[in-house]
Amino acid sequence: MLTFTERLPPRHTASSPPPETVLFSLLLTAEERTRSRYRLDSPEGFSLCFRLPRGTILQDRDFLRGENGEIIQIIAKPEPVITITAPSTDLLLKAAYHLGNRHVALEINPDYLRLAPDSVLQAMLEGLGLAVNEEIAPFNPEIGAYQHYHDLEEAKKG
């Protein structure tokens, strides 16, 4: 079993691992990337165990280091989502406001919003005049205002 206990710095930093050191890439859904304690089997046949600091939320393209130095890359797995677009920025902002009031996991982009399928929310958004499309796509919801603080606290401990 390969046990992963450490998230490495993002790829754009000098301390990121070179691509040739990555054992394999692992596709995980948005929900799976929120689990800090997790066991699964990879498509390559490896038994994996995540023992990451509590509260860790993995992002697309993150790297993890195993107890024996193995490195894997996490990739956002395409999954069922609804993508919201609007004829105006104001209307898209209103949609983000209403979804935020409902504490919905939400991916925010300048041209669209993306969330997990929900028929009640879909009807509300369509009622507001937004275009709602069901699709299969990587889902990268915002991690929230306090995740950055959590990462800083973990760095201070390490």
From Swiss-Prot:
Keyword check for Cell membrane, yes or no. no
Q: Where in the cell is it found?
A: Cytoplasm
- Extract the InterPro entries matched here: UreE, UreE_C_dom, UreE_N, UreE_N_sf
A biological process from GO: urea metabolic process
Entries under Pfam families matching the protein? UreE_C, UreE_N
Q: Which CDD domains match?
A: UreE (cd00571)
**Keyword list, A-Z:** Chaperone, Cytoplasm, Nickel, Nickel insertion
The molecular function terms in GO held by this entry are: nickel cation binding; unfolded protein binding
Q: Does the keyword Cytoplasm apply?
A: yes
**A GO cellular component annotation in the UniProt record:** cytoplasm
SUPFAM superfamilies associated with the record: Urease metallochaperone UreE, C-terminal domain (SSF69737), Urease metallochaperone UreE, N-terminal domain (SSF69287)
Q: Write out the similarity annotation.
A: Belongs to the UreE family.
Q: What does this protein do?
A: Involved in urease metallocenter assembly. Binds nickel. Probably functions as a nickel donor during metallocenter assembly.
Question: What protein name applies here?
Answer: Urease accessory protein UreE
> What is the species of this protein?
Microcystis aeruginosa (strain NIES-843 / IAM M-2473)
Q: What high-level taxonomic lineage is stated for the organism?
A: Bacteria, Bacillati, Cyanobacteriota, Cyanophyceae, Oscillatoriophycideae
Supply the gene name. ureE
